[in-house]
């Protein structure tokens, strides 16, 4: 079956949480009630909480706590801190959170080192407030807003830092609402989202105005064993082709890059398959982001608790030890291997997908931009009059404490949330 045959859009089973809880405050919002209605229509058990605290999330066994949390969808109101946007280079000017948490079971998940508490998926009921808040950030970013190579993206907003929005779209409807919001927004702005899922049918007919770039997080087939609960690679690539033919700017987030057996041929084949999926897409606007695997001592501890017996390569003696600007430790691939992987992947990508603009290559947190100035085209943001960018464009980042415990004074509702002011992980799926 061809990757751009409509029949190939039949995707893996959608996530069905075993427990859906909705707080009292969330029920006061129309978007929250709509999420509740979708869950009930699917026959999911829904629990209306009397207050705004999430309960029953803790368990003395970390593995059991993980299983229970990963089976729970919580409909809550985003806290005020979510309306104070943080920069998220190298992806975008600003991070906007439509939700927090992910239903997938990726054994390298970076949320393991970025969120405290059980990994419950929270979706925010006050979506109109979140979207209306974005206007005050236009023209103030330091990534695309300040880049000659990416200026056509306008002020960019990344929606995949702490979630995979497509993985919960059948329940939340939040990604569709955000796409429509940006499509109707007459300003130099763009929305970015990354996914490891493939259920794109609800997005294909939206009036997106080419202001949303949908990227698909991909890796060779051999890496699929580390990505439980996600759509198979073939389905993701089919979905990539479908949204490209629906006029969306698209992208490949190649992450996390791993030197698996026969990795050179495997990544080359990945790009061949992507080229097949995109064949015939009109006015194609394609980017690529290349992100290598890294881990911290804290995230490794959390992941080993979540996925005992995983054979994901995380041996410190096979890595280089690096320090972040905050003084924390991370383990990345040795420099020689890093250079070899970068050379092979960028060469293969240029050969198989010459139309792709490679935005950057990350080596475990360090960034190498691979600029290829894009020609003006249909993917460009319509001209506008962005506000003058002030001298400062966000608070300094503070590193979260990977795998740290919550303070006993924190409410149960805050368990699992991103630590305020933290940079957060790479976009979801990376």
Feature names for model-found ranges:
Residues 76-88, 111-215:
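Conserved Radical SAM active-site core
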Residues 97-114:
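Local cysteine-cluster metal-coordination motifs and their immediate loop/turn environment
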Residues 1-92:
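Flexible, acidic/Gly-rich N-terminal and inter-domain linker regions that tether
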Residues 262-276:
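Catalytic cores of alpha/beta
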Residues 1-32, 275-430:
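Auxiliary Fe-S-binding modules of radical SAM enzymes
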Residues 244-254:
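A conserved active-site cap/scaffold subdomain adjacent to cofactor or substrate pockets
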Residues 230-243:
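Glycine-rich S-adenosyl-L-methionine
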């Amino acid at each position: 079956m061809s990757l751009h045959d409509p029949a190939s859009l039949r995707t893996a089973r959608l996530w069905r949480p075993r427990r859906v809880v909705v707080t009292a405050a969330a029920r006061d919002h129309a978007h929250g009630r709509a999420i509740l209605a979708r869950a009930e229509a699917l026959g999911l058990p829904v629990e209306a909480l009397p207050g705004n605290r999430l309960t029953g999330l803790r368990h003395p066994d970390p593995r059991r706590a993980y299983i229970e949390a990963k089976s729970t969808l919580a409909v809550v109101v985003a806290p005020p801190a979510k309306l104070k946007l943080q920069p998220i280079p190298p992806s975008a000017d600003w991070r906007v959170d439509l939700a927090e948490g992910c239903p997938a079971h990726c054994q390298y998940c970076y949320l393991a080192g970025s969120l405290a508490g059980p990994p419950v998926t929270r979706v925010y009921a006050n979506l109109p407030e979140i979207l209306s808040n974005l206007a005050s950030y236009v023209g103030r970013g330091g990534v695309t807003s300040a880049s000659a190579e990416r200026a056509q993206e306008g002020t960019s907003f990344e929606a995949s830092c702490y979630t995979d929005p497509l993985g919960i779209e059948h329940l939340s409807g939040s990604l569709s609402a955000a796409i429509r919001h940006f499509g109707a927004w007459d300003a130099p702005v763009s929305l970015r989202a990354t996914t490891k899922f493939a259920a794109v049918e609800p997005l294909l007919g939206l009036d997106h105005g080419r202001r949303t770039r949908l990227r698909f997080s991909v890796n060779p087939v051999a890496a699929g064993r580390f990505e439980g609960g996600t759509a198979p690679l073939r389905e993701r690539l089919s979905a990539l082709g479908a949204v490209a033919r629906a006029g969306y700017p698209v992208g490949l987030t190649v992450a996390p890059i791993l030197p698996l057996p026969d990795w050179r041929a495997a990544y080359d084949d990945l790009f061949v398959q992507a080229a097949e999926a995109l064949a015939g897409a009109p006015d194609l606007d394609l980017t690529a982001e290349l992100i290598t695997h890294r881990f911290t001592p804290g995230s490794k501890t959390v992941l080993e608790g979540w996925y005992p017996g995983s054979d994901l390569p995380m041996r410190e003696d096979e890595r280089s030890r690096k320090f972040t600007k905050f003084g924390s430790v991370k383990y990345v691939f040795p420099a020689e291997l890093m250079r070899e992987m970068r050379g092979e992947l960028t060469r293969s990508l240029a050969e198989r997908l010459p139309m792709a603009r490679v935005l950057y290559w990350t080596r475990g947190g360090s960034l190498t931009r691979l600029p290829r100035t894009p020609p003006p085209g249909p993917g460009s943001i319509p001209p506008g009059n962005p506000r003058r960018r002030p001298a400062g464009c966000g608070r300094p980042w503070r590193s979260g404490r990977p795998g740290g415990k919550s303070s006993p004074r924190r409410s149960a509702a805050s368990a699992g949330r991103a630590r305020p002011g933290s940079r957060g992980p790479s976009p979801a799926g990376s």
